[in-house]
Swiss-Prot record:
GO terms for cellular component: plasma membrane. This is Uncharacterized lipoprotein RP413. Residues 1-17 form the signal peptide. Its main location: membrane. A lipid is attached at C18 (S-diacylglycerol cysteine). Keywords: Cell membrane, Coiled coil, Lipoprotein, Membrane, Palmitate, Signal. It comes from Rickettsia prowazekii (strain Madrid E). Residues 110-136 are annotated as: Disordered. It comes from the Bacteria. Residues 112-126 have a biased composition (Polar residues). The lineage of its organism: Bacteria, Pseudomonadati, Pseudomonadota, Alphaproteobacteria, Rickettsiales. A lipid is attached at C18 (N-palmitoyl cysteine). It is found in: Cell membrane.
Length: 219
C-alpha cells in the first residue's frame, strides 16, 4: 500500500512537470517558501524577489539615488534613421536642449544690452550730427523770421505809396523859407458884389490854383 502511494506521487510529479500550470505551484513564493498560503492573493502569487533588494530599491528611491541603466535592453531599438544598438538617453538630450536654450537667451540678452549701451554712448560723429541738426534748425528759424520781416516791409511800402503823389519827386536841397511874419487871423472881407464865375481872370486864377495843387506834393 505504501509503495502504491509512493508510485502515485511520483507519477503525479512527473506528469505535472510536463505542463506549465502545475509547474507554477511548485515555485517558491515571495516569502521564500515552497508552500505558502499567505503569499497567494487573488489567485496570483507575488514575484520571487529577495526582500533585501526590495528594501534597497526603496531606500534609493527615497534618497533620489537613481542611476541610469546603461545595459538596459529596452534602450536599443531598430530605426531607419538610427543604427541598431544605438543608445538614446532622453533625459540627457532634454537637459542639453534646455541648457542650449538658456545659453542662447543669455547671449541674446547680452547682445541687446550691449547694443542699447552703445547707442546711448556719445561719439564724435553723433555729436557732429547733433550740432549740424541744431544749426540747420536755427538757420531755418532765422530764414523764416527774415521772410516775415520782408513781407512786413513790402506791405508797409504799399501802404505808403497809397498816400503819395504818383509824379512826386524829392528835392534833397530844399530848404523851407524863413519869414519874420507871424501868422495872424484877419477877418474876412465883406463884399456886397457877387462873384462873376464866367470872367476870364477868375478862370485863369482857378487854372493856376489847380496847377499849384497838382505840384503841392513835390518838395
Amino acid at each position: 500500500m505504501f509503495k502504491k502511494i509512493i508510485i502515485l506521487f511520483l507519477g503525479i510529479f512527473l506528469l505535472s512537470s510536463c505542463t506549465d500550470n502545475f509547474r507554477n505551484y511548485f515555485q517558491r513564493s515571495a516569502n521564500n517558501k515552497l508552500l505558502d498560503i499567505k503569499g497567494a492573493k487573488g489567485g496570483k502569487r507575488k514575484p520571487v524577489y529577495n526582500n533585501k533588494y526590495i528594501d534597497l530599491a526603496k531606500k534609493n528611491i527615497l534618497e533620489d539615488n537613481i542611476d541610469d541603466d546603461d545595459n538596459d535592453s529596452d534602450a536599443n531599438y531598430d530605426s531607419d534613421s538610427l543604427l541598431i544598438g544605438e543608445k538614446i538617453d532622453n533625459i540627457k538630450k532634454n537637459r542639453e536642449m534646455y541648457i542650449n536654450m538658456i545659453k542662447r537667451d543669455i547671449a541674446r540678452q547680452k547682445a541687446e544690452s550691449n547694443a542699447t549701451q552703445s547707442n546711448n554712448d556719445m561719439t564724435l560723429s553723433k555729436a557732429n550730427k547733433k550740432v549740424r541738426k541744431d544749426d540747420s534748425y536755427k538757420e531755418k528759424k532765422i530764414e523764416e523770421e527774415l521772410n516775415q520781416i520782408k513781407a512786413m516791409l513790402r506791405e508797409t511800402k504799399r501802404d505808403i505809396t497809397k498816400y503819395t503823389c504818383p509824379n512826386a519827386t524829392v528835392n534833397q536841397n530844399y530848404v523851407p523859407p524863413v519869414t519874420n511874419y507871424e501868422n495872424e487871423n484877419y477877418p474876412p472881407i465883406k463884399n456886397s458884389r457877387p462873384y462873376n464865375n464866367t470872367s476870364k481872370v477868375k478862370q485863369k486864377f482857378i487854372r493856376e490854383d489847380d496847377d499849384n495843387t497838382s505840384n503841392a506834393c513835390s518838395i
